[in-house]
Amino acid sequence: MNPLPRHDHYIAGEWTAPAEGGYFASVNPATAEPWYEAARGTAADVDRAVGAARTAFEDPRWRDLSQTRRGRLLRNLGDLIGDHAERLARTETLDNGKLLREMRAQLAGLPEYFHYYAGLADKIQGEVIPGASRELLNYTLREPVGVVGAITPWNSPLLLTTTKLAPALAAGNTVVVKPSEHTSASLLALAPLFEEAGFPPGVVNVVTGYGPEAGGPLTEHDGVSKVTFTGSSGTGRRIARTCADRLIGCTLELGGKSPNIIFPDADLGSAAMGVIAGIFAAAGQTCVAGSRVLVHREVYDEVLERVTARAATIRIGDPLAETTELGPLAIAEQLEKVESYVELGQAEGGKVVCGGRRPETGLDGYFYSPTVFTGTDNGMRICQEEIFGPVATVMPFGSEEEALAIANDSAYGLAAGVWTRDVNRVHRMAARLEAGTVWANTYRSMSPMSPRAGFKTSGMGTEHGTEVIREYTRLKSVWINTSEEPAGDPFILRS
């Protein structure tokens, strides 16, 4: 049996073996077979990476680089990602099971993030503040915070790392990335492109490993000035506590249990497809998944029939195949979690009207059929807890007020969808839904230009758009006395 390919950490522009010599296998979720080994990072590896990032941050080659030049490097990187898109897309499909055609589309849009922040890099600026007197000049500077620790998830490794890297680098920071232990390959494939784009060594570093062994030391390291994390709300809380103890900032993009609300005047065909896209795309493994489908009683039966009819015909199988519409869940633990929630939902009184089982695919991977529940109450655990899989609950409502009450009755507040032809209703719903993103007659639309934030336990801080620059900069106020008059004795009062 041939040994698996091994990948080391990427630190200071070099492939670096793990300090303690350990490696761990990563599994292809479509086959349930290991396909490479990654370095098992420890506190010593994190310390080395943070040291490299701190050195790069203070190096004149990066510190004194003009903002315009930083923007050029980001544009170079975006172009290189476009050049390597097929390789990166295939790597991520093998690593987390997303459809290859979905990854190709994602990689086609990924350069836009770097190009957008390339254009923003030389527009990060302070302002002049009107002073108390003509002799006092007061202005502000917006400076990089320093070394950013970025901990990224397994569901969309490249995209969700890009949303952190691009603005952090545009602002002049250096970064240490700790990808999920389940999906390190695409980040390791991306890493050498930073130096090829012209970034000095150490500006971007990648340390692989498990959360407690590498992620924990990264958030606790004295050399890290800011932490950004995407993942579960439970882990996010622990990171927030660590950052609070250290008095450093953190940006958290966490879980969701998003409502997708359909009114009787909606285009029901489009709404049903919006439900399908909202919960079954990427096997439901998206933080904004529209897992709670709320349908007005007047059209409940019709919408349910449309949704279940399409869900039952979704083609499940090899994510590399062009005809496949639903790939596997990314990890074995997630498959077990989805199965346990489906069992729980039935025990709570819910009825499975579609799916609810592992499908026959001819593969040994972590596949689960698109599943639709009826007969559920919003107080049930399957309606309140994030499942992170292809499981939807379809619940009726009778009025706008009732829809809002159900939608907002959640610990989460990441996103919401509204389907209606009534533009006044759209505005009313958007104003009262407790969610950081509201979509009307669409779902899962994204752009690097549009800010994204989570309400309640769905997160803290902002990603995307111009607002995110505040997350990666600190504000400095500068006062200058321009008067040529000699300073007087401060203890003599003057009228």
Question: Residue locations for each model-derived region?
Answer:
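A short acidic/small-residue loop/turn micro-motif
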Residues: 17-19, 23-24, 40-44, 266
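Structural signal for hydrophobic packing residues in well-ordered secondary-structure cores
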Residues: 57, 61, 78-85, 89, ...
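Glycine-rich loop-to-alpha-helix module at the N-terminal edge of alpha/beta enzyme cores
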Residues: 33-124
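ALDH superfamily catalytic-core signature
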Residues: 234-377, 440, 487-489, 493-495
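Rossmann-like NAD(P) dinucleotide-binding subdomain of oxidoreductase/dehydrogenase enzymes
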Residues: 126-270, 397
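Residue-level signal for inorganic ion chemistry
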Residues: 13, 32, 70, 92, ...
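Hydrophobic face of amphipathic alpha-helices that form TPR/SEL1-like repeat modules
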Residues: 1-30, 56
